[in-house]
Swiss-Prot record:
Self-association and partners: Monomer.
GO MF annotation: an example: S-adenosylmethionine:tRNA ribosyltransferase-isomerase activity
Function: Transfers and isomerizes the ribose moiety from AdoMet to the 7-aminomethyl group of 7-deazaguanine (preQ1-tRNA) to give epoxyqueuosine (oQ-tRNA).
Keyword vocabulary terms for this entry: Cytoplasm, Queuosine biosynthesis, S-adenosyl-L-methionine, Transferase
UniProt-listed GO biological process terms: queuosine biosynthetic process; tRNA wobble guanine modification
Pfam family, one: Queuosine_synth
Top EC category: transferase
Record family assignment: Belongs to the QueA family.
Name this polypeptide is given: S-adenosylmethionine:tRNA ribosyltransferase-isomerase
Species for this entry: Methylobacterium radiotolerans (strain ATCC 27329 / DSM 1819 / JCM 2831 / NBRC 15690 / NCIMB 10815 / 0-1)
Pathway(s) it belongs to: tRNA modification; tRNA-queuosine biosynthesis
Matches recorded under InterPro entries: QueA, QueA_dom1, QueA_dom2, QueA_sf
E.C. number(s) listed in UniProt: 2.4.99.17
Length: 354
């Protein structure tokens, strides 16, 4: 499909630079294809679902994956270099995006304070592979000491990261470190809202997908067939898969909290829609025409024009439905992107394609 089909005009004033306070106070647009749009709030979510539905949360935790350092070569002046870690390949090894990547070659040493890495490989689009001088928990501690929180560029380009972001940019249930971007739909959920979900008879389950920096990358291809997704590591354990299968068999709906949870569930889905345990990388790229097998509803934020995430929601609820929903959201003053408002999406009879 042509990528320009997923373009739309978004005023700069629609971009949220801070989250709602408290975090469950954001607005929520309910989108049911073929029905009128409904303006609600995130706190209304328990009433918008029904007892027996199962919400699936991504419990990944954001690490301070942005490292600023210096390239060192014998006899050459140091070159300031920024890297964004995005995929761990071994206890001592990470894939990363570097700036300026064009000045790096295999064998270069990078120093980040007390931490040193060697460039093992230089790939396309600014991607490199780094081998660090320590591994495992020792490397994790060094990254935590030297790294910075990787706020999305559309926020970081407008203001500096500060102490508030250390809390605001983590979900309250984050427990498995490894993401370099937050699963932002989950940022809306407070402990009080989670308790309200429980009281309403809704199930809560957790999966893990370590969100990579590829989520920030623009789609540069003119056609979706020309875009490659970067791999992200995910885990759906057997007990959770069994519980979700049982919930659906009993008439409950599977509600993915965020596109990351949805992508993992669809990666783990069998042809009949049941879930199998999953552990490993996924590069699933969902565009209109995709047939969803495992997910019945989706809680998600409002996404960038021409992004893979807007393509995903267009596949889920229909491209024209989402065009209309986003036009309504912009006109009604909804806040967009990571710190913005939420939507609750339901699928149409089948996703539409131009």
């Amino acid at each position: 499909m042509r990528v320009d089909l997923f373009d739309f005009e978004l005023p700069e004033t629609s971009i949220a630079l801070r989250p709602a306070e408290p975090r469950d106070a954001g607005r929520m647009l309910v989108v049911r294809p073929g029905a009128p749009l409904v303006d609600r709030t995130v706190r209304d979510l328990p009433d918008a679902l029904r007892a027996g539905d199962a919400l699936v949360f991504n419990d990944t935790r954001v690490i301070p994956a942005r490292l600023n350092g210096v390239r060192t070569r014998p006899g050459a002046p140091g070159q300031r270099t920024e890297v964004m870690l995005h995929l761990r390949e071994a206890p001592d090894r990470w894939r990363a995006f570097a700036r300026p990547a064009k000045r790096l070659t295999a064998g270069d040493a990078l120093r980040f304070g007390d931490l040193t890495a060697t460039v093992l490989e230089k790939a396309e689009a600014g991607e490199i592979v780094l081998a660090f001088d320590r591994a495992g928990p020792e490397l994790d501690a060094a990254i935590a000491a030297e790294g910075a929180l990787p706020l999305p560029p559309y926020i970081a380009g407008k203001r500096a990261t500060d102490a508030r972001d250390a809390t605001d940019y983590q979900t309250v249930y984050a427990r498995n470190p490894g993401a370099v971007a937050a699963p932002t739909a989950g940022l809306h959920f407070s402990d009080a809202l989670l308790a309200d979900l429980d009281a309403a008879g809704l199930q809560r389950h957790h999966v893990t997908l370590h969100v990579g920096a590829g989520t920030f990358l623009p789609v540069k291809a003119e056609d979706t067939d020309g875009h490659r997704m970067h791999a992200e590591i995910g885990i759906l354990d057997a007990a959770t898969a069994d519980a979700l299968n049982a919930a659906r068999a009993a008439g409950g709906r599977i509600v993915a909290v965020g596109t990351t949870a949805l992508r993992l569930l669809e990666s783990a889905a069998r042809p009949d829609g049941t879930l199998a345990p999953f552990s490993g990388p996924t590069e699933i790229f969902i565009t209109p025409g995709y047939r969803f097998r495992a997910v019945d509803a989706l809680v998600t934020n409002f996404h960038l024009p021409r992004s893979t995430l807007f393509m995903l929601v267009s596949a889920f609820s229909g491209l024209e439905t989402m065009r209309a929903a986003y036009a309504h959201a912009i006109g009604a003053g909804y806040r967009f992107y990571s710190y913005g408002d939420a939507s609750l999406l339901f699928p149409g009879p089948r996703a539409d394609t131009p």
